[in-house]
């Protein structure tokens, strides 16, 4: 891992997404560690709380997903962003992407040109192609390619050029069109139209098969994410739980790492596509004592499910955290332990105020987002025996 990444886009002021890229990784990690320790200091009530060393990965070439705004014109498309001064900037060779992904992004610029699809102009409410979303699986280097269109009008042009693209890049496994008709900078709409027989991308973290569908959330740094899931498995394994809940479970990464044929698992996630992926993974793993349901996690916990209290609960909420209502429900369930995976330590700290009767015993930072302010935190809460 190098100590400093050189980015021309940042130097020229064209892209400021990696706001800390001029700092060596050691300094970036020190700042994140200090922030985490300060936020969680009020919850360290004894010397039993361990702050473990941060887990890091590569500082470039680590990202598995590109979200490209389509700019320019049909004869000269640009995949990237609008710079602070209003310039269309191609980010096909962004250093966060692996080399093969960069090459494919450049090829997709040519694809748009060959198809003659006009980029959407939000200021004029004209054009067709809004975004290109590209996701890479590390298993076989396969890709899921999504075109976000204003309407179905340009689908025929995509279908016309697609055979040549897929012959050149046979690792493109899934292709779809998302229809987003609203004249706003919204990433995707409700309608998804598949142009390939395959509708999901296979990934594997450690020994767990996982699946990615167009609208299911998936970690963007697979190397560090695999370590995150493995650490969760080890921490949970120390409790030998008799039953598990995985709330905000997504495609099932945490729960499937921690479940076994002897440990029943209930996974809850509001996104139906993610639940479909989790069910496929459980089937591949031969787990028949697992159930995944497309429900709101808070509604589930406060409903009839309260009658079947789990031995250990995993929560992996979005940036807003789990909220006071779910914190109250977890406190009432009083499981032996709660494993909280957070992508926002500020909301983690807010939630810890409302989770009553638990000690924070172990914390570890996972740097899934180098050069940014963001990071993931794994926190173990153990029922207070006092």
Curated annotation (Swiss-Prot):
Keyword Methyltransferase appears in the UniProt entry: yes
Binding site for [4Fe-4S] cluster: 7, 15, 18, 94
Keywords: 4Fe-4S, Iron, Iron-sulfur, Metal-binding, Methyltransferase, rRNA processing, S-adenosyl-L-methionine, Transferase
GO BP terms: rRNA base methylation
Enzyme category, top tier: transferase
NCBIfam families: meth_trns_rumB (TIGR02085), rumA (TIGR00479)
PANTHER family named among the record's database cross-references: RNA M5U METHYLTRANSFERASE, TRNA (URACIL(54)-C(5))-METHYLTRANSFERASE
Function: Catalyzes the formation of 5-methyl-uridine at position 747 (m5U747) in 23S rRNA.
Name this polypeptide is given: 23S rRNA (uracil(747)-C(5))-methyltransferase RlmC
Species the sequence originates in: Shewanella oneidensis (strain ATCC 700550 / JCM 31522 / CIP 106686 / LMG 19005 / NCIMB 14063 / MR-1)
Gene name tied to this protein: rlmC
């Amino acid at each position: 891992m190098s100590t400093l990444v050189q980015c021309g886009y940042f130097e020229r002021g064209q892209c400021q997404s990696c706001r800390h890229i001029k700092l060596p990784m050691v300094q970036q990690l020190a700042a994140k560690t200090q922030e985490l320790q300060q936020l969680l200091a009020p919850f360290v009530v004894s010397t039993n709380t361990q702050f473990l060393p941060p887990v890091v990965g590569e500082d470039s070439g680590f990202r598995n997903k590109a979200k490209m705004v389509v700019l320019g014109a049909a004869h000269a498309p640009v995949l990237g962003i609008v710079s602070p001064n209003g310039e269309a900037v191609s980010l096909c060779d962004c250093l966060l992407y692996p080399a093969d992904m960069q090459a494919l992004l450049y090829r997709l610029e040519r694809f748009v040109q060959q198809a003659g699809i006009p980029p959407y102009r939000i200021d004029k409410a004209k054009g067709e192609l809004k975004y290109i979303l590209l996701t890479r699986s590390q298993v076989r280097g396969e890709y899921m390619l999504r075109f976000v269109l204003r309407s179905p009008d340009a689908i025929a042009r995509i279908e016309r050029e697609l055979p040549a693209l897929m012959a050149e890049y046979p690792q493109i496994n899934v292709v779809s069109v998302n229809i987003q008709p609203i004249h706003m900078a919204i990433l995707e709409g409700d309608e998804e139209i598949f142009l390939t027989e395959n509708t999901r991308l296979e990934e594997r973290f450690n020994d767990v098969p996982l699946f990615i569908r167009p609208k299911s959330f998936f970690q963007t740094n697979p190397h560090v994410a695999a370590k995150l899931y493995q650490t969760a498995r080890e921490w949970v394994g120390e409790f030998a739980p008799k039953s598990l809940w995985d709330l905000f479970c997504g495609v099932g990464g945490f729960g499937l790492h921690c479940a076994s044929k002897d440990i029943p698992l209930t996974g809850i996630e509001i996104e139906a596509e993610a639940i479909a992926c989790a069910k496929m993974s459980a089937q591949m793993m031969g787990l028949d004592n697992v159930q995944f349901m497309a429900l709101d996690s808070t509604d589930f916990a406060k409903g009839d499910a309260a009658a079947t209290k789990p031995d250990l609960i995993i929560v992996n909420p979005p940036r807003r955290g789990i909220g006071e209502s779910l914190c109250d429900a977890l406190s009432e369930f009083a499981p032996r332990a709660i494993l909280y995976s957070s992508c926002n330590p500020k909301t983690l700290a807010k939630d810890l105020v409302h989770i009553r009767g638990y000690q924070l015993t172990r914390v570890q930072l996972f740097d899934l987002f180098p050069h940014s302010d963001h990071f993931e935190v794994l926190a173990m809460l153990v029922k207070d025996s006092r």
